[in-house]
Amino acid sequence: MVQKWSEVLWMKERTREVDDNYESYWILENWDDGAYNTGSLANGMTVTLDQEYEMSYFTFGAVDQKTGMNLVKVRYWNDTHGSEEQSVRAQLLEKRDANNNKYYIVRFSHPITANKIHMRLGRDWWDMSAMKVGEIHFHQYDDLERDINDIYANETHTTLKEAVKEQTIADLEKRLEESDAATGEKHPLYSELKLDLQTARALLNNTLSPVYKVHPEITAKKDAHLGFTGLNAWQPLGKTAYAGESVQVIVGHPTKQNGERAELQLVVTQQHAESASVSKTVNLTVGKNEITIPQLTSNNFEKGGQLYIVYTGNNDADNYAVRVNGGSDIPVLDLYKKTGQERTDAIKKYVEDLEEYQSKISEKHNERHKAETSNSVAYTYDEQNCILNATDIMMDEMMYSLPATQVWNSIKGTTTDEKAKALDQALQAMEDTMTLFYQHKGLSNEAVKEKGNNALPSQHLNIRYMRMFAGAFMYAAGNHIGVEWGSATLTGAESWDDFGWGIAHEIGHNINQNSYAIAEITNNYFAQLLTKDEKGTRFNYEDVYKKVTSVTVGRA
């Protein structure tokens, strides 16, 4: 197993002494120490070892750190290159031990040989709360990690070597389950190595998760001129993952090299979340990204949720592809730019998948969650809070992120064909609603060939299953509209009349023009539009005419 061959304890500030004191630590009250911006040896910390060692990671304690870190830069020296510094690409993996104490693993993209290590830490967001490093453990590169890496033909772990058989993987799994004789603990990289072996078996059996081709047309970069900010650029990946779970996000691009920064972010969400703790983003690089799903809430229900990808560039010809290893598969319907038979076929396939999936959620929970040692999901099955009970439907102007059982139960019909037709009609009703609303804002893709500032947004709105605050039954927030369990039945609509005042009212909040918005008033214009045929309007046009021609300022 892993050999713990050096232990370093840091004193406060930038002391470089070993003090044999478990209560001391390195601290910097800043958001970056040279991991985001270019730093020098004056930044970070340097450890000189007693001799040269081969390693692929090291770990350190986070003390009582309140805010996480997500960036690390590593330089090293060895006998071969003397005083010439070397660099290695590294990822910072946030972990929690059995007592829920936070610690970090600094994992290199490949093993290195070093006699001196220099580490710089940081965040890719502005936060001046303290970064802290407690005891550091260096781990010598071990045979198990080497042997697991050796079954792959490439660094990104997308191809197996020809000699790999089922027994090869089974033997490695048996070794991985062995505990260290001295400590009784599993390998520090247990979750990551287990996922590597699961991926290997999926490759061997041709059952790997499909590749998701990113839509580069969906980007916030195109919508800055619109004057309203309630839009959402998330693209669903068909995965849900629990807090603390290890996942691998493999990013491919035809012209970029492994390790190069991708114009992509992974969005991690909390299922049935409060409005303030719905998501967190992780920047991605081309190649393999190892990610530990962060915990977004401390409340007493399952922790975790759907995963999404966001394209942050502005090039319609960009060609990113993404595969997620790990997590749990959930049904997704991607109707972006789909029309005619392609749309019909996609909806029918989704209905078939959803029917099978929703009937087995409780069973899947008991297999994957109730038996899980992680505190994140080790709960008795609760239909309204299980993170497996989720699905996404992405249209051009709207995305639904709702409980799978609620979506299924609200679709009318008995046969697959009847349900597919009813779902198509329900989704068309929402698409027609958004077309109506945007036309009244002067936005359309039908006006002229070069649509310019009058084009429809490239992003969509997002109606999400959320936890309500006191007195609310739905709400509009920065990039989503929150609905509770009883309102998560939008796929049962036969026309836009079925959406009602509330949904239109919240959509109005998110597409209200900032230049004239008066909260709870101007957004109701869209609610009036949606309900006027059935219920009339709360104003008459004669009064409107008198007001706008009166040369007076202020409300009517």
Describe each PLM feature range.
Residues 23-85, 100-143:
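Aromatic, loop-rich ligand-recognition surfaces of beta-strand-rich domains
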